[in-house]
Amino acid sequence: MQILLAALIAYLIGSVSFAVIVSAAMGLADPRSYGSKNPGATNVLRSGNKKAAILTLIGDAFKGWIAVWLARRYGLPDVAIAWVAIAVFIGHLYPVFFRFQGGKGVATAAGVLLAVHPVLGLATALTWLIIAFFFRYSSLAALVAAVFAPLFDVFLFGTNHNPIAWAVLAMSVLLVWRHRGNIAKLLAGEESRIGDKKKAAANGNAQDGGKA
């Protein structure tokens, strides 16, 4: 019962979509309506509003971190922490508060990994940053980081009696699956690079002919 309750709370935390909330608060269009239609920091960046993208990134990472941190704070066993990690991640992918239309989970997964162990989170985040810097593809960086995250975890903690390692692997598999459309675009040379503006995301209520 304790594990079920912890997982449910984690799922509800994960269901808070900061991309949608921040965009609405800052007078931007719903990120599910433009660009990749993904409610995540990279797509919010396509609105041209870097502040909104940064706030989205921080919020999505924080909810992953706080869910796992709370589980540890209250002394839950590793099995429960593993379920909490998966639940908060799934909450981001399929948020009950936003008609189950969620993001792809990169920032939330990063927050989870940082809470599991700072070295694990930083190593995975550094992998993302290196690939993103050289190739300018957020999706490619996410895919590479997803592949390396379970390897980093095994290297740091091994596999014996380590249910969290299975949670990390499950998140990586889900993250890759959520990027299946991006994989097709990467192979076809049609994937958008970081910073591309596919569509103006200013609120339609802007005055003077829609000037920003």
Swiss-Prot record:
Membrane topology field: Multi-pass membrane protein
Family of this protein: Belongs to the PlsY family.
Swiss-Prot/TrEMBL keywords: Cell inner membrane, Cell membrane, Lipid biosynthesis, Lipid metabolism, Membrane, Phospholipid biosynthesis, Phospholipid metabolism, Transferase, Transmembrane, Transmembrane helix
Predominant cellular place of this UniProt entry's protein: membrane
EC number: 2.3.1.275
Lineage: superkingdom: Bacteria
UniProt cross-references to HAMAP family, sorted A to Z: PlsY (MF_01043)
EC category: transferase
Cross-referenced Pfam families: G3P_acyltransf (PF02660)
TM regions (residue ranges): 3-23, 51-71, 78-98, 115-135, 139-159
Name this protein carries in UniProt: Glycerol-3-phosphate acyltransferase
Annotated function: Catalyzes the transfer of an acyl group from acyl-phosphate (acyl-PO(4)) to glycerol-3-phosphate (G3P) to form lysophosphatidic acid (LPA). This enzyme utilizes acyl-phosphate as fatty acyl donor, but not acyl-CoA or acyl-ACP.
GO cellular component: plasma membrane
Keyword Transmembrane in record: yes
Pathway note: Lipid metabolism; phospholipid metabolism
